[in-house]
Amino acid sequence: MNYLILTPDGVGSTYLQRALTVYLNCAGKDYYNPHELLNGLQLKNDILLRKQDASYNWLYEYSQTVENICSMLQQAKNKLVCRIAKYHITRRLQQYDHTEDYEKFYQVCNKVFDKKLFCTRDPFEYAMSWSIRNKTDMLNMYNVKERKDMHFSMDVDVNFFKQKLSEYGAYEFWVKDNFTNLVAVDYDKFHYNPDNELHNITGYEHAVTSKFDI
């Protein structure tokens, strides 16, 4: 069973991906997390990994062709928890002047990944969260103080808000038009009870809390 996480960005996909990888490995399953499929992979002894070397830079990230990515996916023998963020496809299409053909890529993903996790969030909250990020230049909060410091009124860019609403709608169509065996993972439900959500996703009777005694 391979898992593919689909995201527009800003819906907890990185947390879901890491939590799922930890959950599966704690359950005694050997899973790898190369993170994003579209911005740098490598295949070592038929093991698909994230591209990491001294030469890695942002100019490199989209240099791998879709055909090359498909080939690595088809050759990989390890169990995977991977991600596709729709914005990477948008950026790649811009970089390659809309010449890349993603039809085969989607076909390969649907064959290689048994279950596609479709990250969802209330569209208003999604657009508002991004509007606050746009206003404050703060992508995430990492402690209680940072959260308290953000408790104030602010004006947001209405046009930016509408743009994010439109992007979320496009993301929903993109997911449903190109992927099969979809499982929706709600942002709020996952944060409230991740163990329960991960059980529902995998079917395993396992809790991370029992492994780490927390």
Protein language model annotation of sequence segments:
Residues 1-75:
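PAPS-dependent sulfotransferase catalytic core
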Residues 202-214:
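C-terminal accessory extensions appended to soluble enzyme cores
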Residues 84-181, 189-205:
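PAPS-dependent sulfotransferase catalytic domain
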Residues 71-79, 108-112:
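Flexible, charged surface loops at secondary-structure boundaries
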